[in-house]
């Protein structure tokens, strides 16, 4: 909360020297007070920073109609740029005042209790959470609800889900042959040096099978980044897919991917088993 200092006039019993003294004190501490105000600013109701139409957190740009009604950039095209409150045009005039307020609001990272000390702009918590080193990752094994830091996830997976004497590791830049059952949907492998968990997923659709590769880890620039290549050969036909990036996720999605996948058409499928070669390349050092 921001406080205000009130100076009394000489007629109220305070001499001019006292006033000058107070002014000097205020002047000398102005910068410190401004910093303190920034640190201690508190909103009683953060809902005023949400779009009144979709109730999602505002992000820049924010638009307003001629009557001052606000709308987020996602809602404007959905409303055909017509304000639902007064039917005035909306989506052309920015609300700079609200954008300035939004830029000034910082809130603790959702992982503050786990150790993250960063403050993030309001509305960007989810973006930060995806790359926060303190974010918990979900175990990729089917029907397992375990979550932990990415560092501890490998230990859990090895102890709980890995079969004895099963070879589940691979080395970057060395092609790996994998054999997976389409109906099982997922195959887990671990990178030899970092112990990062990689998931090979397949999704059967009416026109073929989608295959994609993900890494279970935050998308932090501090962690290793990878690219990958997939190849599938049958009866002299080869399907090849190369991706410049292995997508890093906190939790696997079991929805058919819309990008970064290899599609094997039905005409090249032979039963329920896929035999593929996968090559993962490290792009930076952790």
Curated annotation (Swiss-Prot):
Keywords: Metal-binding, Transferase, Ubl conjugation pathway, Zinc, Zinc-finger. InterPro entries: Sina-like_RING, SINL_plant, Znf_RING, Znf_RING/FYVE/PHD, Znf_SIAH. It comes from the Eukaryota. Signal peptide: none annotated. It is an enzyme of class 2 (transferase). It catalyses: S-ubiquitinyl-[E2 ubiquitin-conjugating enzyme]-L-cysteine + [acceptor protein]-L-lysine = [E2 ubiquitin-conjugating enzyme]-L-cysteine + N(6)-ubiquitinyl-[acceptor protein]-L-lysine. A zinc finger (SIAH-type) spans 104-162. The keyword Transferase applies. Residues 101-285 are annotated as: SBD. Zn(2+) 2 binds at residues 139, 144, 156, 161. Zn(2+) 1 binds at residues 109, 116, 128, 132. This is E3 ubiquitin-protein ligase SINA-like 7. The lineage of its organism: Eukaryota, Viridiplantae, Streptophyta, Embryophyta, Tracheophyta.
């Amino acid at each position: 909360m921001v406080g205000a200092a009130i100076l009394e006039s000489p007629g109220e019993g305070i001499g001019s020297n006292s006033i000058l003294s107070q002014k000097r004190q205020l002047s000398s501490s102005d910068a410190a007070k401004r910093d303190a105000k920034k640190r201690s600013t508190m909103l009683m109701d953060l809902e005023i920073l949400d779009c009144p139409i979709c109730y999602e957190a505002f992000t820049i740009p924010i638009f307003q109609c001629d009557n001052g009604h606000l709308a987020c950039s996602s809602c404007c095209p959905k409303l055909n740029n017509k304000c639902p409150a007064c039917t005035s045009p909306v989506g052309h005039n920015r609300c700079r005042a609200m954008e300035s307020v939004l830029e000034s609001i910082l809130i603790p990272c959702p992982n503050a209790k786990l150790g993250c000390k960063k403050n993030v702009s309001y509305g960007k918590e989810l973006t930060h959470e995806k790359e926060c080193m303190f974010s918990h990752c979900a175990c990729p094994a089917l029907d397992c609800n375990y979550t932990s830091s990415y560092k501890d996830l490998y230990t859990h997976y090895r102890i709980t889900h890995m079969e004895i004497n099963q070879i589940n590791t691979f080395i970057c830049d060395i092609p790996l042959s994998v054999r997976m059952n389409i109906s099982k949907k997922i195959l887990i492998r671990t990178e030899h040096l970092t112990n990062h968990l990689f998931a090979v997923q397949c999704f059967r659709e009416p026109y073929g099978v989608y295959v994609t590769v993900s890494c279970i880890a935050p998308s932090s620039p501090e962690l290793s980044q990878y690219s990958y290549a997939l190849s599938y050969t049958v009866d002299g036909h080869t399907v090849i897919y190369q991706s410049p990036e292995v997508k890093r996720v906190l939790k696997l999605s079991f929805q058919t991917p819309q990008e970064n996948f290899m599609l094997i058409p039905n005409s090249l499928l032979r039963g329920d088993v896929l035999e593929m070669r996968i090559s993962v390349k490290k792009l930076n050092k952790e």
